[in-house]
Amino acid sequence: MQILQVKKQLVLTSRLKDLGHLPLKALSSETGEIFVAMDPVGTKDGDWVFTIANSAARDAAGDKRLLTDLTVGGIIDDWQPKQK
């Protein structure tokens, strides 16, 4: 699991059927690395979240058939990132 911040929802003109219909969000780490995750919990831009990766990400998304390796597992109520 990893703690990341939601940057924005990705808008897709079309997508593979096996990606399902969950929103996709662009997330970033405290170091600026960008990730894309499925969002079954309804995050907003700026939220800090924890993510579930690898094969467990499909379970967390609610369907083992979905093509994902990263899913938002929950919104963190109070997270203070490290000061740079």
Swiss-Prot record:
Listed Pfam families: EutN_CcmL
Protein transport in keyword set: no
Gene3D superfamilies linked to this entry: EutN/Ccml
Protein family: Belongs to the CcmL/EutN family. CsoS4 subfamily.
Quaternary structure (record): Homopentamer.
Domain notes: The tight homopentamer forms a pore with an opening of about 3.5 Angstroms in diameter which is positively charged.
Protein name, UniProt field: Carboxysome shell vertex protein CsoS4B
